[in-house]
Amino acid sequence: MTQADQAVISLRPGGGGGIGGPRAGRLFPFGASTGSLDFLRPRGGASSGFAAKLGDLRFEPLERVRYTRDQLVELHEIIDIPENILKLKQDIDIELHGEDEPWINNDSSVQTQSYNRYAETDNRDWRSRIEQPVQTPAIGGEEKSWDKFREAKESYISSGKQDQFNNQDKLSSQFSAKAQVGPAPALVKAEVPWSIQRGNLSNKERVLKTVKGILNKLTPEKFDLLKGQLIEAGITTADILKDVISLIFEKAVLEPTFCPMYAQLCFDLNEKLPSFPSEEPGGKEITFKRVLLNNCQEAFEGADNLRSEVNKLTGLDQEMERRDKERLVKLRTLGNIRLVGELLKQKMVPEKIVHHIVQELLGSESNRCPAEENVEAICQFFNTIGKQLDENPKSRRFNDVYFNRLKDLTTNSQLASRLRFMARDVLDLRSNQWVPRREEMKAKKISEIHREAENNLGLRPGSTASIRTGRTGTGGGGPLSPGAFSMNQPGIVGMLPGMPGARKMPGMPGLGSDDWEVPHSRSKPRADPVRNLTPSLANKPSPNNSRLLPQGSAALISGKTSALVGSGGPLSHGLVVTPSQTTGPPKSLIPAPSVDPIVEQPAAAPKPSSTELQKKTISLLKEYFHILLLHEAQQCIEELKSPDYYPEVVKEAINLALDKGTNSIDPLLRLLEHLYNKNVFKATDLETGCLLYSSLLDELAIDLPKAPVHFGEVIGRLVLSHCLSIEVVEDTLKKIEDSFFRAAVFEAMMKIMKANPSGQAILGSHVAKIDACSKLLSSE
């Protein structure tokens, strides 16, 4: 037996070195019939120590030692296991997996798992994964020992306390099974696999998809373009026509603001789309108009059924669902009414249908109050088509009957106050020749929005379009010329007059501290243009097109006169800069012969119009109610420089405060008292302002029911602060025509006065005035 064979068959873990030294090799001469096994027997008192050490060696995670079957059989034949070893093995088994004791020691369990993992033979090739024969030990006694360890391991795994080992074993068994089976099986595909690509759409689905996309993009700006695409979408059958009309109807009723646009679309489609034969023999042909009106009728008649279904949702858990459905039913009802009214304007709905709708909403019994939903719908209906009905003499007679019924509803106590005021608004609208007090919300084109912005901001026509597109007008609408400038260049936008950050160009009106435009005084001495020109401006070539320059700068470039620069006289010192001088290389400027400057007579600044003053007043008042700075508001009002307009300021302040609500009453009174104490406002300004507001109270109280009460509180507190005289109360009440509003103002004022001792003293000293006010209330 060679030395290499001795190293291979060594029972010591690691195969060489350690306990026994070279002695172990001499005691196991495989090939000899007998041998000495004294090292396995206990020697003296070293029995327990040796056993412990042997147990430790069995569980140490050292390198595995492989033995052939023949070697193990030879060992089985020549080795006789001593009783001490068997007893030690039995003690270890009882300690590790006793009959009654649970596995509590985690360390021992980990050691057992480690032992089992390293005790099993692992002959798998993990790289090539080729099946190899597994060597199995053939020792009978040892097989029982390993079986016990394996059973203990399986029972511990089943308890679920070491899932990580379970996962590792499962993974190992999975790899083993795959290695034994051979190649991996093919993937099983689903019968209907998921795919990014959509299935083939039918012609109807394709058309409806196209129509939905067109309706989602429909705006007044793109109306003509998208209308043509909708006509060419492929509406070739009656079923497609009905579904397209349903899509348009749903969009219209859920977007009431765009109902005029959808009504115009329906009118055009009715003219362009073909009609189809009836599906029933002898029936009428299917047209766009007939299908659309059927949808409107079904929605109108089915509203009551929808409300009855909503009323059945009475459970506490159905509260949110009930509210959502109520809102949806209300939106669809009002949208349907609005659409029918707009279709009447397009002559697609006959007037007899309109009268039928009105009679259904008002009810047949004149002494019975209609439902709140019907009252709101009829008010919306008359806001839309009232003017068209009044233009027809025959329909006007019916309108008189309808509006008499509405007038009765304004005094019906069974109706909510919101709806009573809504009916009163419709009556006022008719009495005002159908001219609304406020502009109606409707869809507008971008050009219309820009035009309104230019009018409100005082900009030149086309300024907003130039800012949006980043180019200025060149006359031909083409690209910018080499001499033109782009709006995207830094600092160019700031040169536009009236824009934020605008530069002060020659002759351009200045801006005050509050960003209001203030004309320059003509008596202000003008500086030398040569000194004012910076080197970059004097040497830089300028564009030849003077239209591209800001207002007021044309005179500086071309020498022409401008109304903004002066009264048409030449520039001081006779300096004239021509385009040829600016486009060529820089030359020394030679001034013209000096001429004595013309002394201009100081001219008074033009007086601002009432419209400008009103805009400024509303702006400063809104700013005050936002920041609540008295001194800032005082400065802004003084900068108006129009004491005659102060009563209007008082009226606008009261109007804005009462429109905002009760939280703005205290800031309003602080402002008026502050301006009165600072001698900015006089007593006559406050009195006149209150009279102006009281003359508007009859109309304002329709939208602001609490306005009379709050106005009475304002008057009472102004009287208490001695800013207002008690004599003005009678004149204020005379300006109010409605007796109900008049009584509300007087009662609120008296309540404030009586709650204060000084107010009681004022009332006691002006008994005659109070009696006169009381007579105004009793005379009605």
UniProtKB/Swiss-Prot annotation:
Entry's Gene Ontology molecular function annotations: mRNA binding; translation initiation factor activity
Pfam families: MA3, MIF4G
Region (Disordered), start-end ranges: 457-482, 506-549
Compositional bias ranges of the Polar residues kind: 533-548
Any one GO CC term of the record: eukaryotic translation initiation factor 4F complex
Keyword vocabulary terms for this entry: Initiation factor, Protein biosynthesis, Translation regulation
Residue span, MIF4G domain: 208-432
Domain MI intervals: 612-734
Composition skew (Basic and acidic residues), residue ranges: 517-529
Stored InterPro entries: ARM-type_fold, Initiation_fac_eIF4g_MI, MIF4G-like_typ-3
PANTHER family in the record: EUKARYOTIC TRANSLATION INITIATION FACTOR 4 GAMMA (PTHR23253), EUKARYOTIC TRANSLATION INITIATION FACTOR ISOFORM 4G-1 (PTHR23253:SF53)
Function of the molecule: Plays a role in the accumulation of a sobemovirus (RYMV) during viral infection.
Subunit details: EIF4F is a multi-subunit complex, the composition of which varies with external and internal environmental conditions. It is composed of at least EIF4A, EIF4E and EIF4G. In higher plants two isoforms of EIF4F have been identified, named isoform EIF4F and isoform EIF(iso)4F. Isoform EIF4F has subunits p220 and p26, whereas isoform EIF(iso)4F has subunits p82 and p28.
Family (UniProt): Belongs to the eukaryotic initiation factor 4G family.
Name of this protein: Eukaryotic translation initiation factor isoform 4G-2
